[in-house]
């Protein structure tokens, strides 16, 4: 929550803007810390902080801003965009969706499983670019599952005291999101999903163990909604066409991950899918290179940020033309004649 406020603020200031920021109400302690810091560093006429929830956000959206930058869910992104449209305000929307990871079996599967485990469990899966589900070539399915289990134990249970005791493993941000993620698992279990690993929860501590689900199908909510938690459904596939057919049935994701050493497979997946950004043989790096644009497409976001892209996003590219001498434009003043027509023909050819 700190990064998601400060990161765009830096670019807004760099582009010469005065700014109002509203931190998430779901991380109230961070919001308070940000408010204190900003008030110490800036005059309120330069950068102001508004704390609060939906009522405060609703009032802010009534104002005629020059630009609005929002990070959150597609559902709230639609509300922001609708409000901005009343003033024809430009928006940057960093949203989310179901970011898939494709595993074709041509990489070292232990290493691949380790990367996926890290990306899925970072901040307990509560990042907008976390891998939401995995598509694994059917011959590599069991090896990947075994590798994922080993990676979870390696990362969060090296002393064999249990993952719940790990100081490196996070918790779900609040009770409502804990209940939402838990309900996704329960719904999947009721509809036939198998828990390959994990499944333990502690409501009081808002702890959800990293959980790997197999035998999932599209009727399960875990394959319909963005998970935003440490749950990874795994789907096996036979051929590349199966992968793209499934992926293209979803709204375009914020990130697509391709774990492959096969150039033909990689190019096929790139050519036949749409995503905000793509990582090949790595996870979670679509937003860290300042030379690359970061952002979604359609349901996963509007606009691009990162490096110069953020600077331009918070700027108005204003063209200015000044005549230094002469007045050649008089050549095309009316009344029009054949000479002017010939002049236009030459200009068009040029």
Give, region by region, the residue ranges found by the protein language model.
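Short internal beta-strands
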Residues: 20-25, 134-135, 282
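ALDH superfamily catalytic-core signature
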Residues: 42, 75-217, 280, 348-349
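Conserved C-terminal structural/oligomerization subdomain of aldehyde/semialdehyde dehydrogenase
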Residues: 102, 207-350
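Residue-level signal for inorganic ion chemistry
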Residues: 16, 47, 68, 97, ...
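Short glycine-enriched loop/turn motifs at secondary-structure junctions
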Residues: 62, 95-96, 127-129, 165-167, ...
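Rossmann-like NAD(P) dinucleotide-binding subdomain of oxidoreductase/dehydrogenase enzymes
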Residues: 1-111, 166, 237
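A generic structural signal for well-ordered alpha-helical segments
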Residues: 12, 84, 148, 188, ...
């Amino acid at each position: 929550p700190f990064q998601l406020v400060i990161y765009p603020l830096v670019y807004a200031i760099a582009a010469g803007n005065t700014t109002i920021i509203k931190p998430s109400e779901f991380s109230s302690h961070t919001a308070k810390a940000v408010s204190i810091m900003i008030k110490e560093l800036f005059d309120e006429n330069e950068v102001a902080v508004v704390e609060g929830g939906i009522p405060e956000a609703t009032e802010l959206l009534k104002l005629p801003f020059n630009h609005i930058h929002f990070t959150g869910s597609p559902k709230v992104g639609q509300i922001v965009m609708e409000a901005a449209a009343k003033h024809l305000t430009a928006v940057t929307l960093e949203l989310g969706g179901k970011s898939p990871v494709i595993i074709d079996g041509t990489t070292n599967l232990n290493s691949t499983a380790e990367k996926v485990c890290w990306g899925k469990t970072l901040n307990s899966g509560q990042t907008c670019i976390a891998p939401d589900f995995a598509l694994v070539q059917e011959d590599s399915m069991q090896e990947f599952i075994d590798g994922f289990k080993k990676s979870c134990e390696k990362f969060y249970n090296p002393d064999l005291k249990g993952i719940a005791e790990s100081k490196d493993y996070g918790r779900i941000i609040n009770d409502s999101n804990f209940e939402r993620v838990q309900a996704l698992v329960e719904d999947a279990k009721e509809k036939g999903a198998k828990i390959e690993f994990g499944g333990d929860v502690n409501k009081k501590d808002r702890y959800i163990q990293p959980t790997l689900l197999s035998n999932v199908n599209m009727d399960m909510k875990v394959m319909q909604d963005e998970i935003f938690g440490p749950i990874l459904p795994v789907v096996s596939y036979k051929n590349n066409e199966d992968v793209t057919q499934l992926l293209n049935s979803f709204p375009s994701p914020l990130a697509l991950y391709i774990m492959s050493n096969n150039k033909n497979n990689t190019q096929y997946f790139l050519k036949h899918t749409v995503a905000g950004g793509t990582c090949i043989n790595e996870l979670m790096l679509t937003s860290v290179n300042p030379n690359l644009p970061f952002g979604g497409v359609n349901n996963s976001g509007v606009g691009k940020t990162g490096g110069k892209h953020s600077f331009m996003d918070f700027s108005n590219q204003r063209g200015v033309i000044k005549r230094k001498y002469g007045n050649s434009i008089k050549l095309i003043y009316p009344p029009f004649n054949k000479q002017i027509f010939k002049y236009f023909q030459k200009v068009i050819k040029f």
